[in-house]
């Protein structure tokens, strides 16, 4: 609270800078049911922690950064068989819904009826192709709801995100995800007899 309060005053420039840094962090608490929800027509530039504004952010990216949104669609088509397009559509009652077009069907499916893995992969791609990357991105167990074959490519996406200047912290229990991680990128926690935990880098382990 002190950082947030003092950071609003111009004379505390260092605190204000620190405040902006923290406010730019993204600690994911992604929830499938939240991401399935529709949104009132509005405006959102960045994906929320739970993903409940996924439709609004998709609409924003499509309208303001069409090239990036096209990259997301191309990645989706590569990783989710049958996905032809995704669009955020406004309904007659002023709601924004995501519609997924499968090439084998005439009519698109709204987000409520697509698989958990399809929705989660789309949300991750929207997050990772954000035109304004977060300085710190924290993801817990990205393997949940995703097919193991997708994890290596997802790991590469996280690595590319980090190479653009941000930091990425990921906790995982998936050997498939770990297989795509370089040794110098991998750490684990060891519990010590004194009750504390020790962080060990895989490349330093004999």
Model features per residue range: what roles?
Residues 128-131, 161:
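Hydrophobic helix-cap positions at the C-terminus of alpha-helices
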Residues 153-206:
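C-terminal lobe/lid and adjacent interdomain/linker elements of RecA-like ASCE P-loop ATPase modules
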Residues 74-129, 136-149:
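Conserved ABC ATPase signature
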Residues 1-74:
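Electropositive, glycine-dotted interaction segments
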Residues 1, 97-101, 186-187:
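Short polybasic amphipathic segments
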Residues 134-136, 167:
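Residue-level preference for the first positions of well-ordered beta-strands
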Residues 57, 106-110, 197:
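Short small-residue beta-strand/loop micro-motif enriched in glycine and branched aliphatics
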